[in-house]
Amino acid sequence: MTGAKTNQVDQRPLSITDLLHFIPYDLQQTFLFEAILSYGKIYNLYPIKWVFLIALALFEIGSLICGAAPSSVGLIMGRVVAGIGSGGLFAGAILLVAEFKPLNERAFYNGMLGAMYSVASVAGPLMGGAFTERVTWRLCFYINLPLGVVTAVIVFLLVPNNYDSGRDSRRGLPLKKKLQEMDLYGLVVLVPTIICILLATQWGGTKYSWGNARIIALFVVGFVLFVAFVVIEIWQGDRAIVPPSLVKRRTVWACSIFSFCLFGSFLVVAYFLPLWFQAIKGDTATESGIHNLPSILGTTIFSVAAGGMVFGLGYYTWACILGSVLAAVGAGLLSTLEVDSNAAKWIGYQVLYGAGCGFGLNQPLIAIQAALPDFQKSEGTAVVIFMQTFGGTIAIAVAQNVFNNKLVSNILAAGIPVDPAALLSVGATKLQGLVQPQFFGRLQLAYNDSITQTFYVAVATAGLSMAGSILIPWLSVKQAVAPEDAETANTVMPFQHPSSDVDLAMPAILRQSGEIASEDSQSSDIEKVPRNNEVSTYDSQTSEVEKSSVGSTNRKVESIRN
């Protein structure tokens, strides 16, 4: 709800332009992107509990400022503060689960977190529209205050203070060194990079043509700044907000591609489908929310179900692939909706699409937990969430362009006596008052065609997400149990790298038992990150972390020696 763009501090109903600008370029989005990556570092440098509570406090303060804003300037400033705070909330929740639950159980809990996130993404704007139409837009922000207080109390009372004190050796650094770890150079360059890209995608094809000098200049400057950002990240090394060693890992970049595309598809459907109900079926904001329940329920149920299935099967890559396929098919079916489509169609299509998003959206965060050592998990989580959020922003901007251009061309082609600019400036429920009754049928057809065209964007992005899903390595969230006899010691399990877990784990086990005196004498490609009686080892050839239980690996070592 707090993401809904409010151009004026008044009590007018949300217009189509307001809804289409739900996630465009603005200061909150820019600072949100910055904050997401920054929190990846901050969670390594400071205790997760207190960073999460501070982020929540900033979000609450920003919401309070927005709700009480006497002018648009106050609203903008409040959204900046809220954006800085909200950037650390979802990543913090994921990391808190990672601290208290073993890897094989995190899929289920992350599934529930993802289900709630999906519900909020769809229901939030609809509730915001209802508040704006029936009460006041300020309630969109004030409602966050009691919810945030309850969350803060729960985290404060139930999460121990020093549970992760040994998580990262950098936590003992002085403040000056910690500031150097934050990669301020990269952050400074990233701000104008994001602004240029978002402005170009938002203005191109609407305010200016794609060939306009302003749009070309924005893309060129954005590209140059992006190159500069990459150079800075390489120069900064492990201090970078996006460390090159992290980007090289197949799991990270494959999950980033997948999340960028699938979440972009999800947001396009989430924000244009309610418009279809309001414009074509004559729903109010509240009614469109009710008719959108099949999508919400589909995403929620299958998100939890996927988490349980990953917990049982051990693998998550299959869920990403299945999610891409179902989402692409579901979005394609939604693009066939007509003015006279019956309930069976729009309910069934929503359930299918929701199932795809439910299966796929949360798995990249599980993949990060399975593939990365502890000291990189917060940064890896932040990168994936950043790409997810950025992908949604770009997809919405592209879909907005498609809708605006198609609607204008349809209105002109149908000869409907209405100003397209005036049509875009009113709410979707106010269409009948714009034209004479004999033209309303043609207006509905023009609107239907324009909205369903945006679902092609959802089809394309869901289809592209498959490129990322099939590249995500098949790693298991279950602990590897070593065979008891030497004959089967080298047996390769399905989807397992041919290198045995003994080969990978032995240096770490020997170091732990004192048989190797110095860690420096071993290859730097092997990292020891103990947790929950596990030893995590990293093989540079596979670029993944493989885990084995200390006890079972000792048995395998003994078996080989014999």
From Swiss-Prot:
Keywords: Cell membrane, Glycoprotein, Membrane, Transmembrane, Transmembrane helix, Transport. It is a multi-pass membrane protein. Glycans are attached at residue 448. One of its GO terms (molecular function) is transmembrane transporter activity. Residues 533-554 have a biased composition (Polar residues). The keyword Glycoprotein applies. It is found in: Cell membrane. Induction: Expression is up-regulated during the late stage of P.nodorum wheat leaf infection and is controlled by the cluster specific transporter elcR. The chain crosses the membrane at residues 50-70, 80-100, 111-131, 139-159, 184-204, 215-235, 257-277, 288-308, 309-329, 351-371, 383-403, 455-475. One of its GO terms (biological process) is transmembrane transport. GO terms for cellular component: plasma membrane. Residues 515-562 are annotated as: Disordered. Belongs to the major facilitator superfamily. TCR/Tet family. PANTHER family: MAJOR FACILITATOR SUPERFAMILY (PTHR23501), MFS EFFLUX TRANSPORTER INPD-RELATED (PTHR23501:SF199). MFS-type efflux pump; part of the gene cluster that mediates the biosynthesis of elsinochrome C, a perelyenequinone phytotoxin structurally similar to cercosporin. This is MFS-type efflux pump elcC. The gene is elcC.
